[in-house]
Amino acid sequence: MVKKKKILVVVDAPGPAEFIESVVPLLKEKAEVLLVTVNTSTNAPYNILRKFDPLRADREKDARQIYELFNPDILAIATSSLVLGPYVNNEFTRLAHEHGIKIICFQDFWANHRWPMNWQMMKYWDKVLTPDKLAEKFLLEDGYEKKIEVTGNPNFDRFVKLNKAKERRWLRKKFNLAENDFVILYVGRGTPQSWEYEEITFDFFAKTIRLAQEEIEDKNILVAVRPHPRDENPVRYGKFFKGLRLLDTGSFPSSDDLLPIFDLVAGMQSTNHIEACYLRIPAVCIVLPKAGRLVMEKISLADFPPNLIGASVGIYSHNEESEKETFKKIISDSKCRAEIQKAQKKYFPLPKTSAAKKVAEEILKG
């Protein structure tokens, strides 16, 4: 009997956890798998992967004991999102390099290898699995010379079978929404390293939506706020709520299940904007000079990529009076929404093959 490979999988943030979630069962069919989550106080990756009963390694010193007890043949590790630490992913990567095993990095978002803690580790990665050609392009621009495989993001496989119209009807009925209710999902980005930028952005958003509603008579704008899974103060938005019509979606733990109900997605740059593109939901990425712009500069991105191709709309000016027109146009002008959706269909086609299977194959190859 051929001995099964031992694969150690490590994630430290919700995005990578969602990327690898549908891959884990496929790996377990052919290998011995140890899944490890690295958590801050919100336990975000652990909560997503809880059904697999993952080990926790929430301190850098936990890495060595876990690694040596399991003694893996392959390390599959996500690009880290914990800019402020703990830097457990880096410890696992160093250990794998010391032991001479294959290190496969999987990347869920464009250019996040440019965060300092990931930049230090790139030289150890034998292969990087990227969500698309643009992510590959950024790696090549930054001098990565080893193997790159464009696998797609397994988290987006689910959109192929999703009946958006059916789900939308069911959700709107459940929440007692009227025909003229226009629902905006505000996606939070209040992580420990970005919460100050997040408050600037949401304050701007709330003021702008209030101004837009004053001038739109045929639509009732409702806002559903979904804090980031790693937000350590998710009630921060309450101080900005005055004058907004709110839709309470707290009974749904996952934003993914709610997406079809929304008419617009807004917030600082996030994976939810990409999901909106796949579901043909207009999205607004708010990149203010003293908020989102500063976040993007830290990974050397000039703009959020979907904005550049018209698949989402970028807001760059901290001027509520002028930017209300952007929201008014999207809310009131069906031709504007159709143009956005046309670009989304062109640049974000639904996957034709399973990204989960492709990722599993590439990890098993080593």
List each model region and its residues:
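Active-site and donor-binding regions of nucleotide-sugar-utilizing enzymes
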Residues: L8-N163, R230-E232, S254, N272-H273
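Short acidic-hydrophobic, aromatic-tinged amphipathic segments that line or gate anion-handling sites
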Residues: D53-R59, R245-G250, S312-S322
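Donor nucleotide-activated moiety binding/catalytic core segment of transferases
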Residues: D58-D62, I66-Y67, A224, P229-I274, ...
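Short, flexible/disordered intra-domain loops and linkers
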Residues: S81-Y87, P192-D203, R293-K298
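Catalytic binding pocket for nucleotide-activated donors in carbohydrate/polymer assembly enzymes
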Residues: W125, Q269-Y347
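C-terminal alpha-helical cap of glycosyltransferases
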Residues: P351-G366
